[in-house]
């Protein structure tokens, strides 16, 4: 894929990076990322993906912008309060980088919409505000073999990991029981969610381009109040209901059935012509 003169100039500083180059930039341009949540985490992730030149970004978030969102949601403006936040996010990203494509989905993640969203993506970023949506994204990414960058924070604490289906523990392995999570029950400082979001965006760029060493199979925990960072390897549960061995067998059978049904439908269409 050739770059336009504008693209070459726009991305010239990162193309200079050892191990990145034009090949890394091409991989970003050819990639589609889905970001669930467009808040202090997801919005900032999307900002740096857009700046880096990820070819298509799908933003998924229902609901309107609230005044108390503005301490951390840097894609928004005060004048947008009361309106669907995902559309303002799209506008801001395209103003930053009109060379990319941005799709705005003003919906919350549900069992009905998540598969269609994930199937379009080369990578997913889990920045949703509750674990119901996070678990749905995790399950879909495992089903369809899509890498997922998992990022979450509460107060001054945060964690980050990369989940590669079939290789690493999934979110259900890390949290076999859903954590108690009240979206209004903890304070949030914009600089904390922003710091985590920058690391999450970088993690995704690493996975897409091969730059550096991503956190595959490692969980990075952060206490940003004391600048304390630690890494550990979470347990990969062979009996996990989402990614365990038996689940993989069921998934393989499911995909084969889906492919067979697709071929049958195509055959039926041809026979009607």
Spans of features found by a protein language model:
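Serine residues within intrinsically disordered or low-complexity segments
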Residues: 264-267, 271
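Adenine nucleotide-associated cytosolic modules
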Residues: 1-261, 273
């Amino acid at each position: 894929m050739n770059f336009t003169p504008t693209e070459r100039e726009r991305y010239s500083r990162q193309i200079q990076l050892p191990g990145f180059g034009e090949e890394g930039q091409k991989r970003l341009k050819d990639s589609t990322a889905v970001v669930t949540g467009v808040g202090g985490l997801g919005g900032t992730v999307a900002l740096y993906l857009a700046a880096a030149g990820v070819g298509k970004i799908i933003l998924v978030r229902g609901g309107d912008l609230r005044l108390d969102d503005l301490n951390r949601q840097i894609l928004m403006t005060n004048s947008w309060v009361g309106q669907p936040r995902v559309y303002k996010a799209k506008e801001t990203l395209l103003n930053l980088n009109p060379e990319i494509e941005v799709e705005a989905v003003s919906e919350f993640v549900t069992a009905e919409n998540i598969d269609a969203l994930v199937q379009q993506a080369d990578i997913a970023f889990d920045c949703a505000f509750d674990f119901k949506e996070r678990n749905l994204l995790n399950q879909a990414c495992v089903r369809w073999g899509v890498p997922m960058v998992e990022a979450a924070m509460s107060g001054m604490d945060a964690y980050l990991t990369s989940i590669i289906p079939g290789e690493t523990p999934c979110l259900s392995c890390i949290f076999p029981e859903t954590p108690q999570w009240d979206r209004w029950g903890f304070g949030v400082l914009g600089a904390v969610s922003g710091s985590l979001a920058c690391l999450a965006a970088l993690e995704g760029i690493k996975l897409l381009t091969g730059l550096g060493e991503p956190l595959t199979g490692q969980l990075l925990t952060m206490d940003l109040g004391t600048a304390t960072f630690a890494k550990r390897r979470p347990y990969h549960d062979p009996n996990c209901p989402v990614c365990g061995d038996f689940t993989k067998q069921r998934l393989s059978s499911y995909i084969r059935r889906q492919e067979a049904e697709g071929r049958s439908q195509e055959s039926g269409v041809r026979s009607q012509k």
